[in-house]
Amino acid sequence: METEVIEVNCPTCGKIVIWGEQSPYRPFCCKRCQLIDLGEWADEEKRISSNGELSDSDEWSEEDPLQH
């Protein structure tokens, strides 16, 4: 039984990375690329889009809404 080798591109540099135990930083090719990506998120160069912004007047809760 042959195991299919899955290859992905490093999101930072584009280098091909084998998706497996031999690639501990997957999907990144190395620790450096992983840290570059983390820095971009920390500097808010990357963000997850939303429908709108929460303001201080918006009501929200960290509680599970199903428990009310």
From Swiss-Prot:
Protein's GO biological process: regulation of DNA-templated transcription
Binding site for Zn(2+): C10, C13, C29, C33
GO terms for MF: DNA topoisomerase type II (double strand cut, ATP-hydrolyzing) inhibitor activity; zinc ion binding
Pfam family, one: YacG
Acidic residues: compositionally biased ranges: 55-68
Record keywords: Metal-binding, Zinc
Record's keyword annotation contains Nucleotide-binding: no
Superkingdom of the source species: Bacteria
Cofactor binding notes: Binds 1 zinc ion.
Cofactor(s) named in the record: Zn(2+)
Transmembrane segments: none
Region feature (Disordered): 47-68
Known role: Inhibits all the catalytic activities of DNA gyrase by preventing its interaction with DNA. Acts by binding directly to the C-terminal domain of GyrB, which probably disrupts DNA binding by the gyrase.
HAMAP family: DNA_gyrase_inhibitor_YacG
Entry-linked NCBIfam families: PRK00418.1
Oligomeric form and interacting partners: Interacts with GyrB.
Family indicated by similarity: Belongs to the DNA gyrase inhibitor YacG family.
Name assigned to this protein: DNA gyrase inhibitor YacG
Native source organism of the sequence: Yersinia enterocolitica serotype O:8 / biotype 1B (strain NCTC 13174 / 8081)
Phylogenetic classification of the source organism: Bacteria, Pseudomonadati, Pseudomonadota, Gammaproteobacteria, Enterobacterales
